[in-house]
């Protein structure tokens, strides 16, 4: 048997090589387009495709080649604004500035007094100065918290981002003697919104943890301060304070309370008696009733013959004598009138 070996000529290999080069070139071009769009994206974040196209049409007409050249010049003029990060609260103001820039370029195109590349360069320089004078966002303050005031808008991808910090703060250890006072302050170093701030307190006894599943609510605590007085061993454990803005958590603080100190000495018998007297419920007070002695009690009880009682006895005797005299006189008068 004879074996045949097929040999490929350079002409047959050339199409496959050319196809590979074309594929690599397409991929490189795609990466360049993506990189370019992400590099000068401030222009793309605050203007629309239709707005940019309209500007170039007013400058160069509707010929596609000239429009592509104009668009490249417009995008290239904003190269200095690559990777810009601005205060998120200034985003609306910057959008208005880009809108005003677009209107200004359209007016320049209508007057046809300067070439488009010069107009684009001047517009980009003005916007760069505007961005540099925007109010800066405060820096992130570690170690924790959802810090809205530090939110930044990234032109590189037209998105906003918060500080890369956890919501949970580190546990603060507190060593308090038995019988003393424990004071917890739910305060963070970063700026909080001015309104709709609430505080929620939770507690888990006996452990040092940040696992929220173990905690139970403390309905009696609502403000940013919490106090325990006097501290007892049952208060040992982890206290958690959640700062909320419109029911959205901004930070969770943890306080581990370690109660130390010996138990109080046993009370003496005198201290026990004194505490019982102090805690005893007062009895009903006795009402003093006035005493009005009778005539027999005045005569039989020598202690009752006070000055007032003697006067009362004399008055009674005089009244009795006068009554008897009057009765005798009335009787004699009746008797004599009958005779």
Curated annotation (Swiss-Prot):
Recorded name of the encoding gene: Spaca6
Quaternary data: Forms a complex with IZUMO1 and TMEM81 on spermatocyte cell membrane required for fertilization.
Cystine pairs: 42-155, 45-158, 56-70, 140-163, 144-169, 186-241
Entry remark concerning the domains of this protein: The extracellular domain shows strong structural similarity with IZUMO1 but does not interact with the IZUMO1 receptor IZUMO1R/JUNO.
Segments on the Cytoplasmic side according to the record's topology features: 332-339
Domain named Ig-like: residues: 166-251
GO CC entries: acrosomal membrane; acrosomal vesicle; membrane; plasma membrane
Effect of gene knockout: Male infertility. Testis appearance, size and weight are normal and there is no effect on sperm morphology or motility but there is a failure of sperm-egg interaction and fusion. Spermatozoa undergo normal acrosomal reaction and can penetrate the zona pellucida but accumulate in the perivitelline space as they are unable to fuse with the egg plasma membrane to complete fertilization. No effect on amount or localization of sperm-egg fusion protein IZUMO1.
Signal sequence annotation: 1-41
Transmembrane residue ranges: 311-331
Function: Sperm protein required for fusion of sperm with the egg membrane during fertilization. May regulate the expression of sperm surface protein DCST2.
Protein topology in the membrane: Single-pass type I membrane protein
Keywords: Cytoplasmic vesicle, Disulfide bond, Fertilization, Glycoprotein, Immunoglobulin domain, Membrane, Signal, Transmembrane, Transmembrane helix
Keyword match Glycoprotein: yes
InterPro entries for this protein: Ig-like_dom (IPR007110), Ig-like_dom_sf (IPR036179), SPACA6 (IPR034549)
Protein name: Sperm acrosome membrane-associated protein 6
């Amino acid at each position: 048997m004879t074996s045949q070996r097929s040999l490929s000529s350079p002409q047959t290999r050339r199409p496959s090589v050319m196809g590979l080069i074309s594929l690599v070139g397409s991929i490189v071009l795609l990466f360049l387009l993506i990189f370019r769009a992400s590099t000068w994206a401030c222009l793309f974040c605050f203007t629309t495709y239709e707005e940019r196209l309209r500007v170039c049409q007013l400058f160069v007409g509707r010929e596609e080649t000239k429009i592509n050249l104009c668009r490249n010049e417009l995008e290239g003029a904003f190269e200095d604004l690559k990777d810009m990060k601005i205060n998120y609260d200034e985003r609306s103001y910057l959008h208005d500035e880009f809108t005003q820039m677009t209107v200004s370029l359209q007016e320049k195109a209508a007057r046809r007094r300067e070439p488009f590349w010069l107009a684009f360069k001047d517009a980009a320089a003005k916007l760069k100065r505007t961005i540099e004078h925007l109010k800066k966002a405060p820096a992130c303050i570690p170690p924790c918290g959802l810090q809205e005031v530090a939110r930044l808008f990234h032109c590189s991808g037209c998105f906003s981002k918060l500080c890369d910090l956890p919501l949970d703060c580190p546990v603060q250890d507190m060593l308090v003697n038995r019988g003393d006072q424990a004071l917890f302050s739910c305060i963070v170093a970063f700026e909080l919104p001015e309104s709709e701030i609430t505080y929620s307190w939770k507690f888990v006894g006996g452990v040092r943890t940040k696992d929220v599943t173990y905690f139970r609510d403390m309905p009696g605590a609502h403000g940013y301060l919490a106090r325990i007085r006097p501290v007892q061993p049952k208060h040992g454990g982890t206290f958690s304070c959640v700062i909320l803005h419109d029911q959205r958590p901004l930070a969770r603080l943890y306080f581990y309370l370690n109660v130390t100190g010996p138990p109080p000495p046993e009370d003496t018998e005198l201290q026990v008696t004194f505490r019982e007297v102090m805690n005893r419920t007062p009895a009903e007070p006795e009402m003093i009733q006035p005493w009005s002695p009778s005539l027999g009690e005045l005569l039989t009880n020598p202690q009752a013959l006070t000055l007032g009682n003697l006067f009362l006895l004399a008055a009674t005797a005089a009244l009795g004598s006068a009554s008897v005299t009057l009765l005798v006189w009335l009787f004699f008068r009746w008797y004599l009138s009958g005779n």
